[in-house]
Amino acid sequence: MEAPVARLFLLLLLGSWTPAPGSASSEAPPLINEDVKRTVDLSSHLAKVTAEVVLAHLGGSSTSRATSFLLALEPELEARLAHLGVQVKGEDEEDNNLEVRETKIKGKSGRFFIVKLPVALDPGAKISVIVETVYTHVLQPYPTQITQSEKQFVVFEGNHYFYSPYPTKTQTMRVKLASRNVESYTKLGNPTRSEDLLDYGPFRDVPAYSQDTFKVHYENNSPFLTITSMTRVIEVSHWGNIAVEENVDLKHTGAVLKGPFSRYDYQRQPDSGISSIRSFKTILPAAAQDVYYRDEIGNVSTSHLLILDDSVEMEIRPRFPLFGGWKTHYIVGYNLPSYEYLYNLGDQYALKMRFVDHVFDEQVIDSLTVKIILPEGAKNIEIDSPYEISRAPDELHYTYLDTFGRPVIVAYKKNLVEQHIQDIVVHYTFNKVLMLQEPLLVVAAFYILFFTVIIYVRLDFSITKDPAAEARMKVACITEQVLTLVNKRIGLYRHFDETVNRYKQSRDISTLNSGKKSLETEHKALTSEIALLQSRLKTEGSDLCDRVSEMQKLDAQVKELVLKSAVEAERLVAGKLKKDTYIENEKLISGKRQELVTKIDHILDAL
């Protein structure tokens, strides 16, 4: 008797289910979740929910076969969904991913998905499927701020029941936590607790769209590392190389560090900053070479590279540990051989590469921009992606020897996790003749260069010689040297005048004698140089030779007056000459000297 009664109860529950518009009607096959085993993995900063669902076709008055079924997301978590995948239990995962398409349900809010079954379900038949969902940023730190020595606790809120548009006959839920330290958790159905596990259920005869808040507050010191923004640039060359560069903005999205940071305590105490991030590992393709890792300052030498058989493991250690709320930025780049990723048949090319690659375990990428730079001349570009991505208008990129630019595919996606590490395929056409464009440009450039050099060396660009002009230039050069030497000689006189004045004040005869000796030596040298230049002017046939000769004679008179002034000063100091007489004589000497200097200036102006 119990089985018919339970069956009648479930049929009554099905009467309240609203089918999907367009995909189901009042004659939609009656489905039921016969058994659901749900696992909620909260051991990292992600919430991974896996449900093993035994889906049954009740049959009854309906004889139609079920070709698809509906999935619903919990209203509290639907906005943070990063990944949804459905597979048939017990079959090869790679070949058995079911087609999932988002849809709407009339009269119901929230997000719903239609899952296409691999084989139509007959009345009375069953099928076991595995529903995998991954949610990001649903574990909230509580308290939101902690000191360096405190541990991190988080709160998660979900649903005790499997949220579904179908009634569920029996269901259980196992919650896997990051530690055994649990502050509190909801007690619906007297759950059992063992170490870091919470087991709920079984819950029986659960109506469709049932909700009951599940909440747990527990210790979670796993790295709450989030890539807030990432730009991945892939540059393809048909000459055998693919260059990859990733610009990454990182942030610790756990509990914000409260108070100061002590590096001394951090190094001394193993449990200091237990929720901080010292380093993480990035897995690069096995063929990666010429790997570099740098930030705004420059190359970061604390990174380590380990080459394995199937990958290249890179340990990235930022310049400082990351605590809650702290950010950093870095760039990783490497080269790949194109023969492993680029395929062609004639002018048809296909590039098969990952849309996003591994950055760290349990990665979360809030915003990703991928730029694929194709060779110049690539046309008819199409993209095949395993999941939905957003395209921006194509751009152009210019580099060495480019003429009309390389096409750049720009694609965006938000909220990515490890499940998005899948290949995309870029199809395009490329005329192989264009591969000769750059070598021909180089050859043409060298040809033009050599031709220009040949023409240049065969042309005569020399200026016709003018003997008269050359003579004038030589005379001008000699005259310039004469002017310089005359000015130096006049400077000697001024310097000697200062020596005489110092002598009159100090009455030190050695100062005067030293000044006379210096004057005689330097004056003789300058006069000899001027005489040599005078002879060169005479050789050039210039009439300036006579003027220089006249200037030499005037200078001899100036020198004589300068020395006479010194003699008068000696007589004054020795008391052989009265001061009034000395002043009168000095006035006469200065007048004659000034007259001679004026004549010399006129000659210099004439030169």
Swiss-Prot record:
Presence of keyword Ubl conjugation: yes
Cytoplasmic side: 456-607
Annotated crosslink Glycyl lysine isopeptide (Lys-Gly) (interchain with G-Cter in SUMO2) location: 538
Stretches in topological domain Lumenal: 24-434
Pfam families in UniProt: Ribophorin_I (PF04597)
PTM notes: Ubiquitinated by the ECS(ASB11) complex.
Keyword Membrane: yes
Keywords on record: Acetylation, Endoplasmic reticulum, Glycoprotein, Isopeptide bond, Membrane, Signal, Transmembrane, Transmembrane helix, Ubl conjugation
Residues that span the membrane, as ranges: 435-455
Superkingdom of the organism of origin: Eukaryota
Glycosylated residues, chain numbering: 299
Pathway(s) this gene product operates in, as recorded in its UniProt entry: Protein modification; protein glycosylation
Alphabetical GO biological process terms: protein N-linked glycosylation via asparagine
InterPro entries to which the protein is assigned, alphabetical: Ribophorin_I
Modified residues (N6-acetyllysine): 187, 538
Gene Ontology terms: cellular component: oligosaccharyltransferase complex
Matches recorded under PANTHER family: DOLICHYL-DIPHOSPHOOLIGOSACCHARIDE--PROTEIN GLYCOSYLTRANSFERASE SUBUNIT 1, RIBOPHORIN I
Its biological purpose: Subunit of the oligosaccharyl transferase (OST) complex that catalyzes the initial transfer of a defined glycan (Glc(3)Man(9)GlcNAc(2) in eukaryotes) from the lipid carrier dolichol-pyrophosphate to an asparagine residue within an Asn-X-Ser/Thr consensus motif in nascent polypeptide chains, the first step in protein N-glycosylation. N-glycosylation occurs cotranslationally and the complex associates with the Sec61 complex at the channel-forming translocon complex that mediates protein translocation across the endoplasmic reticulum (ER). All subunits are required for a maximal enzyme activity.
Assembly mode: Component of the oligosaccharyltransferase (OST) complex. OST exists in two different complex forms which contain common core subunits RPN1, RPN2, OST48, OST4, DAD1 and TMEM258, either STT3A or STT3B as catalytic subunits, and form-specific accessory subunits. STT3A complex assembly occurs through the formation of 3 subcomplexes. Subcomplex 1 contains RPN1 and TMEM258, subcomplex 2 contains the STT3A-specific subunits STT3A, DC2/OSTC, and KCP2 as well as the core subunit OST4, and subcomplex 3 contains RPN2, DAD1, and OST48.
Stated name of the protein: Dolichyl-diphosphooligosaccharide--protein glycosyltransferase subunit 1
Organism: Macaca fascicularis
Lineage start: Eukaryota, Metazoa, Chordata, Craniata, Vertebrata
